[in-house]
């Protein structure tokens, strides 16, 4: 999906200017890159939120700054910790012929037989760092779990890249596994305590009276 964002260059970073930008529905941002002069810009907060929803956090973006186009990656987003509103964004201009390192969502697909048998699906990695040409950045890396039985694991080495990217992880790193069903005694650990009997404090032994 092609993502296009419009932006305007701003000339200063005074607090009054930043407040005015935010009051008008925008956010301040910066554009930087090896072959690009650093620019202070402003963009529509609503447009960036839409781009994040539709394309994800690490998609390639065409950023139009006062009529000039840049191929960029969104490298950092700052939000208000209480309201969650966008506050600032950093865009990195990229060379379309040079590989970049990006983090991409891991999306588990399929239904694992082990889960149907009572096992518990545990996902250890929710993102993978990959090295890829900007035009080939996938929206997500799908990992098929439809063959997993209880006790089975899927590792980084099992991921099919199609030759379009390299994964910056050890092949032995676990992406997902099916844990055995919990036994009843594990769920209700320890015997039920008799009424009136005080609990033993952790790290101390209790001795019978008398």
Curated annotation (Swiss-Prot):
Part of the 50S ribosomal subunit; part of the 5S rRNA/L5/L18/L25 subcomplex. Contacts the 5S rRNA. Binds to the 5S rRNA independently of L5 and L18. GO terms for cellular component: cytosolic large ribosomal subunit. InterPro entries: Rbsml_bL25/Gln-tRNA_synth_N, Ribosomal_bL25/Gln-tRNA_synth, Ribosomal_bL25_b-dom, Ribosomal_bL25_C, Ribosomal_bL25_long, Ribosomal_L25_dom, Ribosomal_uL5_bac-type. Keywords: Ribonucleoprotein, Ribosomal protein, RNA-binding, rRNA-binding. Gene3D superfamilies: Ribosomal protein L25, beta domain, Ribosomal Protein L25, Chain P. One of its GO terms (biological process) is translation. Belongs to the bacterial ribosomal protein bL25 family. CTC subfamily. This is one of the proteins that binds to the 5S RNA in the ribosome where it forms part of the central protuberance. This is Large ribosomal subunit protein bL25. HAMAP family: Ribosomal_bL25_CTC. GO terms for molecular function: 5S rRNA binding; structural constituent of ribosome. Residues 201-210 have a biased composition (Basic and acidic residues). Residues 179-210 are annotated as: Disordered. It holds the Pfam family Ribosomal_TL5_C.
């Amino acid at each position: 999906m092609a993502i296009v964002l419009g932006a305007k260059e701003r000339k200063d970073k005074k607090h009054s200017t930043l407040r005015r930008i935010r009051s008008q529905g925008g956010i301040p941002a910066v554009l930087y890159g090896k072959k690009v002069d650093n620019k202070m810009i402003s963009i529509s907060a609503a447009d960036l939120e839409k781009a994040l929803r539709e394309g994800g956090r690490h998609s390639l973006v065409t950023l139009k700054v006062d009529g000039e186009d840049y191929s960029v990656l969104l490298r950092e987003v700052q939000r208000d910790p209480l309201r969650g509103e966008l506050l600032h964004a950093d865009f990195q201009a990229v060379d379309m012929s040079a590989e970049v390192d990006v983090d991409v969502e891991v999306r588990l697909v399929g239904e694992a037989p082990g889960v149907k048998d009572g096992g518990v699906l545990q996902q250890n990695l929710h993102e993978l760092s990959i090295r890829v040409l900007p035009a080939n950045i996938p929206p997500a890396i799908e990992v098929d779990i439809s063959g997993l039985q209880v006790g089975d694991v899927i590792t980084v080495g099992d991921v099919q890249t199609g030759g379009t990217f390299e994964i910056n992880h050890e092949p032995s790193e676990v992406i997902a596994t099916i844990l055995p069903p919990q036994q009843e005694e594990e769920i209700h650990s320890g015997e039920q305590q008799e009424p009136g009997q005080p609990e033993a404090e952790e790290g101390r032994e209790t001795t019978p009276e008398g």
